[in-house]
Amino acid sequence: MSISIETLEGLQRRVTITVAADKIEAAYKEQLKGYAKNARVDGFRKGKVPHAIIEQRFGLAARQDVLSDEMQRAFFDAVIAEKINLAGRPTFTPNNYQPSQEFSFTATFEVFPEVELKGLENIEVEKPVVEITEADLDKMIDVLRKQQATWAESQAAAQAEDRVVIDFVGSVDGEEFEGGKATDFTLAMGQSRMIPGFEEGIVGHKAGEQFDIDVTFPEEYHAENLKGKAAKFAITLKKVENIVLPELTEEFVKKFGSAKTVEDLRAEIKKNMQRELKNAVTARVKNQVINGLIAQNEIEVPAAAVAEEVDVLRRQAVQRFGGKPEMAAQLPAELFEADAKRRVQVGLLLSTVIGTNELKVDEKRVEETIAEIASAYEQPAEVVAHYAKNRQLTENIRNVVLEEQAVEVVLAKAKVTEKATSFDEVMAQQAQG
């Protein structure tokens, strides 16, 4: 077998492969034997059809099968022999073939680029330094108390976090609009459920009052006919309720986890907050490292690899929204191309870090990561056992750990500054992505 490789535009390559005639003929004869074993021809018993008839009837199909199989086999032999870093599927083009002659074909494909990392020392990373305070714990306790809260009717003026029952009628330029009217609508204020200015217009009014609120719909509002429009809402305030938070008693504490005292609950909450904080800081640092790697190392990515990643993102999107698998192909590729390209870039850059530094997965760290995940559940031992039985889940964790190790290698060479940050600020940044 002879092999010649041409470099085309960018990452495209073309390989021409020639396979010896005797190899093709030997494969052809074996293929005919297979046809002969199963061929049914009138006047002959199964497996007893003369060779000439078998060749006459099935020779063309047998040769096509042989040539197709040989292109696949010979190409992948060439990939191994020439150490080609293949990206995506090849396109085969057979040349004219005559029986008893050598067979040649071309395969066009893309390769992954050879990446030589540079500029790691120019990557700037700001690492949040956070101390979880007693005030942070108090806020988290209040969240739990609000989950168990009750409401008490009040004759006082509505405040920013009260719950109200209202009738309202909205109009634009004096005309009511669709979806702008409701009766006995219950609104828990302070959660930004309504358009800006709506809740603020209720604050200060008492039950039984009727009044108007002037607001402006945001430019990004979902209803096209209301975007940026000034509107008036006629409000009837029927009821005002104040939130009543439960006392921090042992009975209240026992509703959450295994804690028996307020001190136990605070310790448990702090442990959970520390875990969330660690994950958020790790994610923030990793994102900065990756952004820096991309900025310092502009690399061309194979279109085939991006296309494959687009398909992955399509399927994930359909699955996330509960659609049928066949709907994935209907989603426009351009919706996912930017994310797909970034994923391929990140994969190539981190793979280069891993390969260059000969990194191996830290198995102890894998065990610690699984244990940390399990600690968030009521039965951590069962979660650990579940990971032990599920090879794919464990492999996912191993990949995450190896990526973290690669990020740490880059981080050791980058310009890292520490910034004192509050718990709320870090978690808000995490929520924004």
From Swiss-Prot:
Q: Which SUPFAM superfamilies match?
A: FKBP-like (SSF54534), Triger factor/SurA peptide-binding domain-like (SSF109998), Trigger factor ribosome-binding domain (SSF102735)
**Can the keyword Disulfide bond be found in this entry's annotation?**
no
Reaction catalysis annotation:
[protein]-peptidylproline (omega=180) = [protein]-peptidylproline (omega=0)
Cytoplasm as a keyword?
yes
Enzyme Commission designation: 5.2.1.8
User: What Gene Ontology cellular-component terms does the record carry?
Assistant: cytoplasm
Record's subcellular location: Cytoplasm
What NCBIfam families does this protein map onto?
tig (TIGR00115)
**Sorted alphabetically, which PANTHER family does this protein's record hold?**
TRIGGER FACTOR CHAPERONE AND PEPTIDYL-PROLYL CIS/TRANS ISOMERASE, TRIGGER FACTOR-LIKE PROTEIN TIG, CHLOROPLASTIC
Q: What does this protein do?
A: Involved in protein export. Acts as a chaperone by maintaining the newly synthesized protein in an open conformation. Functions as a peptidyl-prolyl cis-trans isomerase.
Per the record, the similarity remark reads: Belongs to the FKBP-type PPIase family. Tig subfamily.
Q: What is the protein's given name?
A: Trigger factor
